[in-house]
């Protein structure tokens, strides 16, 4: 009887040891008792984030610039390489769950020379097949597979977040560059008007119609406007270099379109549900 209790006790200890070696449990999304419809969801649940970037930016020049950036940007290449690396690790961890088969082939040749034409050689061949299988007793291999899958999916989301960031940065820099072009064009028009004003002020001064003060004031306005041109040209050059850097190029001129003076914007943009916006956050998805 005592021996029977001892066996039961040992079995309980074994079960306890197995349960204590469990690494963790799979995550299950909790079920929430929420109402079918909220008062705040009467608006359209469609978000502007559901649209592709080429649907938002219809400028063909900008589209080509974004495509080149996504293809040649150095950070984007690193992210793509990281995805490939983790995809390979995922396949390796998945393969570790199954038996491993390997083979080896040996070839050997022995030769003996007894002098003269007395020559003897012996060749031998040997082949070996090795089968190994690690029993996943504690779940280490399964959890390693799950971890590699999570890392792989996280790298995809990181690449997606980088893509969205690059698209936004290129589009913003592009529109800022076009705005600087328009500003420079206005300044140059103003500069031409100032030059004409100085010419007329000089004629009036020489004709005795105005004092020298008016003529000098026109010259001051001309000089002040002229200083704006090199400053805007410098800003344009810096912005072009920024865009070229994002595209993985050396500093160069950036082609751009001329935007119309009147741009029609939608009266409202669909923002979607707050919960949907939260799920789109790159850090949450990753």
Each language-model region and where it sits:
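A short structural micro-motif
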Residues: 85-89, 222-225
């Amino acid at each position: 009887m005592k021996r029977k209790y001892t066996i039961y006790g040992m079995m309980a200890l074994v079960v306890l040891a197995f349960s204590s070696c469990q690494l963790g449990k799979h995550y299950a999304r909790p079920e929430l008792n929420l109402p079918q419809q909220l008062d705040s969801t009467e608006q359209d649940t469609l978000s502007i984030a559901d649209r592709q970037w080429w649907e938002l930016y219809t400028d063909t020049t900008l589209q080509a610039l974004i495509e080149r950036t996504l293809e040649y940007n150095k950070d984007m290449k690193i992210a793509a390489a990281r995805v490939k690396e983790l995809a390979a690790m995922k396949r390796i961890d998945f393969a570790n769950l199954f038996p491993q088969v390997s083979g080896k082939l040996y070839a050997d040749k022995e030769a003996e020379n007894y002098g003269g034409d007395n020559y003897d050689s012996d060749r031998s061949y040997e082949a070996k097949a090795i089968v190994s299988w690690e029993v996943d007793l504690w779940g280490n291999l399964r959890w390693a597979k799950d971890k590699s899958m999570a890392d792989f999916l996280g790298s995809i989301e990181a690449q997606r977040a980088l893509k969205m960031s690059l698209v936004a940065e290129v589009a913003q820099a592009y529109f800022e560059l076009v705005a600087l072009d328009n500003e420079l064009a206005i300044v140059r028009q103003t500069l031409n008007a100032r030059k004409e004003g100085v010419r007329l002020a000089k004629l009036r001064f020489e004709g005795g119609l105005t004092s020298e003060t008016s003529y000098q004031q026109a010259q001051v306005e001309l000089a002040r406007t002229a200083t704006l041109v090199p400053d805007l040209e410098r800003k344009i050059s810096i912005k072009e270099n920024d865009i070229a850097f994002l595209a993985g190029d050396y500093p160069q001129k950036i082609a751009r379109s001329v935007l119309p003076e009147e741009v029609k914007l939608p009266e409202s943009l669909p923002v979607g549900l707050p919960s949907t916006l939260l799920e789109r956050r790159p850090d949450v998805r990753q």
